[in-house]
């Protein structure tokens, strides 16, 4: 899937809030970098942490919500 399509799909999951998406991708990428389990069902060895996080959100593997 192209990056633009993936981003559009992920944006739907966060009600088109680009700031929320950017924050969620950053936090999830940091967790992955620190050893969190990747939730995708295919090999991600050549992918950047941010790409993995974006795919997890787009595929609905993790839920993003506002806290507070």
Curated annotation (Swiss-Prot):
Q: What biological function has been recorded for the protein in this entry?
A: Promotes RNA polymerase assembly. Latches the N- and C-terminal regions of the beta' subunit thereby facilitating its interaction with the beta and alpha subunits.
Q: Is Transcription among the key words of this record?
A: yes
**Which biological process terms from the Gene Ontology are attached to this UniProt entry?**
DNA-templated transcription
| Enzyme Commission designation | 2.7.7.6
Q: Quote the subunit structure annotation.
A: The RNAP catalytic core consists of 2 alpha, 1 beta, 1 beta' and 1 omega subunit. When a sigma factor is associated with the core the holoenzyme is formed, which can initiate transcription.
Q: What's the gene?
A: rpoZ
Catalytic reaction annotation = RNA(n) + a ribonucleoside 5'-triphosphate = RNA(n+1) + diphosphate
What's one Pfam family here? RNA_pol_Rpb6
Query: What InterPro entries does the record point to?
Result: DNA-dir_RNA_pol_omega, Pol_omega/Rpo6/RPB6, RPB6/omega-like_sf
The reply on keyword Nucleotidyltransferase is yes
By what name is this protein known? DNA-directed RNA polymerase subunit omega
Query: What does UniProt give as GO cellular component?
Result: DNA-directed RNA polymerase complex
The record's comment on protein family reads: Belongs to the RNA polymerase subunit omega family.
List the molecular function annotations (GO) for this entry: DNA binding; DNA-directed RNA polymerase activity
The organism of origin for this protein = Sulfurovum sp. (strain NBC37-1)
Alphabetic keyword roster: DNA-directed RNA polymerase, Nucleotidyltransferase, Transcription, Transferase
């Amino acid at each position: 899937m192209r990056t633009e399509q993936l981003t559009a799909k992920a944006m739907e999951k966060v009600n088109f809030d680009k700031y929320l998406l950017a924050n969620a991708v950053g936090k999830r990428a940091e967790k992955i970098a620190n050893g969190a389990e990747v939730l995708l069902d295919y090999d991600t060895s050549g992918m950047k942490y941010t790409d993995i996080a974006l795919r997890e959100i787009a595929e609905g593997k993790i839920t993003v919500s506002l806290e507070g």
